[in-house]
């Protein structure tokens, strides 16, 4: 997902606490005049048969689906093998994320945090819990959800979590996050549909590879980061800090903005930016160390590892059409997954909207959006060679019987995934100092352009993690076996998620970016 680093720089759209109408789909973009007017986050790997790279963002799929070009949907339909950053439908992914976040047995957050910091954190969480009823949408209430349940789904068991994960959890306790519960994010939606269509699915990363670097910060660095996070949230609540971008801006750029815009700048870390020229010198040193550590561990090493595993999967499936869906930030900027593939000799071209996709059942005709069905009743397999023509690019509303809180999108590494998408932007103090404190809505982390020394070019030498670890893959045969004994793996986590995220209260928050994510 850079001059001086300030603590986790949090963005907030300061507005009233009242629940407000959902903005128009597409982040207020105008409907495109033609397919060629759409943004395309699709790249084609030139081989026979072709393979595809598709850039996602971690927002409810209904906000972007109408703006995804038909040829991107056709590439997905034509593929037989679909891969994601993590296997979002595997209960192990969920339980591993939950375990990774917990303090050692017998320890609680109050035991490890300084007293003042702990109580500041608790006051902030109490505030969020108080605000959630006003953030909820009528649709959520109509489905029988209540505020305490939503809060516990995100923040449950927070006193048992490691401080670095609490920091990320706080960043996701926002009005936007609460209001989006109930609709799968784009990545998860594609994963669910791929399994329902009996495609072979898999992942190029393991949970531990995303989780362990976060736990690698030393304790003083973690305290610094958590303190800076709370300072930013407190400033937002006091009305003294404003942010240049929100999730709506991200959606708008994805749907109809500039693909090279700073909001998609991938020269970012997946954690908040910590540098600020007003910090004391010793804190600036700490900020630089954190920034450098995560830039290497969560951006450059990840892109190299992901690129190598893409190549391994292509080698193993030379006669298959493969579709790789990663966060868009992995394909934009410098030292990207695409750079790794090109340096290895593969030919990777951006595929504009409107350009025909050549493959089985995908020669020029747009494919329909995957039909949404209840996770409890998986759709029959849809062979790639029998894809009908599209009738509408608009997805239907998820069925009422689908429990929106227990949907697997709850378990995405949300803060990590969000941060992949955000470019670094400078913050500015509010000019009107006499303005009354405003409510804290749509809180997001933003990252500034760096003036620190750029890292060396992405190395291509084998690394233990990229060479010895094989990607997770689930074949259509395995999916058929699952059908014979119970629900498909895309539906099984619906209940498994709850168990995976209930260490002590019903549903602890698990962090995609995810990422990813």
Swiss-Prot record:
It is a single-pass type I membrane protein. Induction: Transiently induced during 3T3-L1 cell differentiation into adipocytes. In vivo, down-regulated by fasting in both white and brown adipose tissues. High-fat diet down-regulates expression in white adipose tissue and up-regulates it in brown adipose tissue. Its main location: membrane. It comes from the Eukaryota. Residues 516-517 are cytoplasmic. Divalent metal cations. Mn(2+) or Co(2+). CDD domains: Tiki. Its EC number is 3.4.-.-. Its cofactor is Mn(2+); Co(2+). Residues 382-395 have a biased composition (Low complexity). GO terms for molecular function: metal ion binding; metalloendopeptidase activity; Wnt-protein binding. Residues 1-19 form the signal peptide. Residues 20-494 are extracellular. It is an enzyme of class 3 (hydrolase). It is found in: Cell membrane. GO terms for biological process: negative regulation of Wnt signaling pathway; positive regulation of protein-containing complex assembly; proteolysis; Wnt signaling pathway. Pfam families: TraB_PrgY_gumN. Residues 366-381 have a biased composition (Pro residues). Highly expressed in heart and kidney. Also found in white and brown adipose tissue. Metalloprotease that acts as a negative regulator of the Wnt signaling pathway by mediating the cleavage of the 8 N-terminal residues of a subset of Wnt proteins. Following cleavage, Wnt proteins become oxidized and form large disulfide-bond oligomers, leading to their inactivation. Able to cleave WNT3A, WNT5, but not WNT11. Required for head formation. Belongs to the TIKI family. This is Metalloprotease TIKI2.
